[in-house]
A protein has these predicted regions:
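Catalytic metal-binding/acid-base residues of hydrolase active sites
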Residues: 80, 102, 204, 225, ...
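Binuclear metal-ion centers of metallo-dependent hydrolases, dominated by the metallo-beta-lactamase
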Residues: 163, 207-286
């Protein structure tokens, strides 16, 4: 009997170990709306010899990996999405989440077509009502089949509400996201919290209701556009104060303009704060 109990105990331990999952976050792009360098070759103060200063437009990939199976979630479809996903080796997307509809977050949307063709089904896109009201008319052909363009739609829209849990399912298991509102000039953008990590790419301030979602984080990927203040984005000093005030353990700066050099930031920032760079990733066990 004892031998049988030991066998079952060992089996249970092995089963638990085999079901361990990780959440992997990849910074696909961390540049401002014009990227670094700008299209005219302007690097600003960024050293062109440092590859970590080459910044495509903002986007991240969130993956839950369980026993070599993945649930893959893309946040925003930047104009650089094709190259970003190719470099990251992405062959499947289970869902796309949108922070807002600005061109640097949505310009690559048409390249989602390949994932719809591979799966022979529409890709699920999640966005709030305000973003949908602007994004869907602009890219109507992606969401609605029609005689005018002659192509089937490739995307299915799903309207989400701020502060309500969103669960994305896929081969690697479920990922829980909480969208929260952020002030972004004259509009709201969405931040997303998952597994005590938050993504805040385009933000100048937060409504009071959102503060709980950015407090005591393990990781915060957060907007730090430039050195001087800006009407729609947080500048460096403001972001650093947020990180301190909200007791964030680790922070990664994103949406960085040409006046923020990677090496200079590394030398000046506290140890728990780093500038992002395209392709950087980190994982946590869950």
């Amino acid at each position: 009997m004892k031998k049988l109990q030991i066998i079952f105990l060992n089996y249970s331990i092995k089963l638990k170990l085999s079901m361990n999952s990780v959440i992997k976050t990849t910074i696909l792009g961390c540049g401002s709306s014009g990227g670094v360098p700008r299209i005219d070759g302007d690097w600003g103060v960024c050293d062109p010899n440092n590859v970590k200063n080459i910044r495509s437009r903002c986007s991240i990939l969130v993956e839950k990996i369980t026993n070599d199976k993945k649930t893959v979630v893309l946040i925003d479809t930047s104009p650089d999405m094709r190259q970003q996903l190719w470099k990251a080796g992405v062959t499947n997307i289970d869902a796309v989440l949108y922070t807002h509809d600005h061109a640097d977050q949505s310009g690559g949307i048409d390249d989602l077509r390949v994932f719809a063709l591979r799966k022979r089904e529409r890709v699920n896109v999640y966005l709030d009502k305000d973003t949908a009201s602007r994004l869907i008319p602009r890219f109507n052909y992606c969401f609605k089949s029609g005689e005018k363009h002659g192509y089937p739609s490739i995307l299915s829209e799903n309207i989400i509400d701020p502060y309500k849990e969103l669960i994305i399912s896929g081969p690697g298991g479920e990922i829980s996201f909480i969208p929260f509102l952020q002030h972004h000039g004259s509009i709201f953008s969405l931040g997303f919290k998952y597994n005590n990590i938050a993504y805040s790419s385009d933000v100048v301030d937060f409504p009071n209701k959102s503060l709980n979602y950015i407090s005591n984080l393990d990781y915060w990927i957060v907007d730090a556009l430039r050195v001087t203040p800006h009407p729609t984005h947080a500048h460096l000093d403001k972001t650093l104060q947020w990180i301190k005030d909200f007791n964030c353990k680790n922070a990664l700066l994103t949406n960085m303009h040409i006046d923020l050099d990677y090496e200079q930031l590394c030398n000046e920032l506290p140890n728990n704060i780093k500038p992002s760079y395209d392709g950087f990733s980190f994982s946590i066990d869950i």
